[in-house]
Every structure is written in structure tokens, then in C-alpha cells.
């Protein structure tokens, strides 16, 4: 159950733990018992821990902009800083992946 904020005319702002189905209904103030309407407030990001704040930012970015990494088969980042080359077939002189997809193509794997 989420916490909702309500504002009492005499006591001020208070929070209440309520069901989501009761979110739009007014709540009774804990101090005076007066019926109080729900208020909308901004998130408390300023008092949140820096690690939590960065985790929220990271989750927001990953929702529509996933981070991708390009790596080669040798494990380096793709620019071949390790000075290795992909294995070459002795018969065709082409890298192994190209040889496999052309020579032993699988017709049932259309679109892959």
C-alpha cells in the first residue's frame, strides 16, 4: 500500500498508508480527526541519497534509451586494440562467420 499526503486545515500536512482504491477519498487527520483532502506534492529528490538519485536517473534512461556495448569476438571493444584478427578459413580466405552463413546456410532460419 502506498503513502498518500493529505492536508488538514488545523494541523497541516500528514501522510497516510492507504489502499490504491481509496486514493481519491479524503482521510481523517491523526491529530484532530478532521476529514482532509489529498494533496499532490513533488518528489523529495533533494533529501534523497545521491546513490538512490543516480539509480532513479539510470532507470529512467534505460526505459527508452538502453545502453548498448559493441564487442568483437576476441573480447575487446571492437577497435581490436588487442591486435588480434578473427580466424580465417584456409579454403576461402574469409572470416569464419562469413563462411558459415554462406556455405552452411540454414533455410529455416529466415531473417536471422
UniProtKB/Swiss-Prot annotation:
Biased composition (Polar residues): 74-102
Entry annotated with the keyword Cytoplasm: yes
Start-end of Basic and acidic residues biased regions: 52-68
Main localization of the protein described in the UniProt heading: cytoplasm
Claim: Cytoplasm is one of the keywords in the record: yes
Location(s) in or outside the cell: Cytoplasm
Name of the protein in question: Putative regulatory protein FmdB
Organism: Methylophilus methylotrophus (Bacterium W3A1)
